[in-house]
Amino acid sequence: MLFRFLSVRAVFFLAVFSVVILWTYACDCPDETRQQKCRRTDFTFLGNANFVALTSVQSSLYIRYCFSIWRVFKDRSFALSSPCIVTPFDTIACGIRIQLYEPYIVSGVHTRSGNIAQACDWNERWSDVPFFYRFQVLNQPDYCLP
C-alpha cells in the first residue's frame, strides 16, 4: 500500500514538473502589431500551401510547406525564388501549422537553411485577418516596408 502511494506521488510530481518545463520553454513572442511583424521579416506573401512534407534541417525536425503565391508584399534578398518555407515541427519551438489549400498570409526570415516561418511572424489564415488589415496590406504598397 505504501509503495502504491509513493508511486502515485512520484507520477504526480513528474507530471507537474513536465508541465512547468513545457510552460517555461514555450514559444514566447513579443507583443507586436501585424504591421510590426510584417516589417521585421524578410518576406511576406499571400498564397495557399499545396505541398507539405517533413524534413530535417541541422538534425532538427521541420515541416516544409510549398505555396502557390498569389501576391508578394515583401521579398527582401529574393527569399521567394523558392516558394517554400520550413517551420519547426514542435509548436513549443514556435512552429506553425498551415492547412493545405487555404489562403494564408505568410512571413518569415531567409536563412542559409531556407525560408523560416515561425509563430512570432505574421502567419495567419487570410479569412481570420480583419477586413481593415486586409484592406491596408492590399492597398498600401509600403505597409510591410520599414
Swiss-Prot record:
Source organism per UniProt: Margaritifera margaritifera
Record keyword ATP-binding present: no
Organism lineage: Eukaryota, Metazoa, Spiralia, Lophotrochozoa, Mollusca
InterPro entries per the UniProt record, alphabetical: TIMP-like_OB-fold (IPR008993)
Domain of life of the source: Eukaryota
Cited Gene3D superfamilies: 2.40.50.120
Assigned keywords, A-Z: Secreted, Signal
Protein name as annotated: Uncharacterized shell protein 6
Tissue note: Prismatic layer of shell (at protein level). Expressed primarily in the mantle with highest level in the mantle edge and lower level in the mantle pallium.
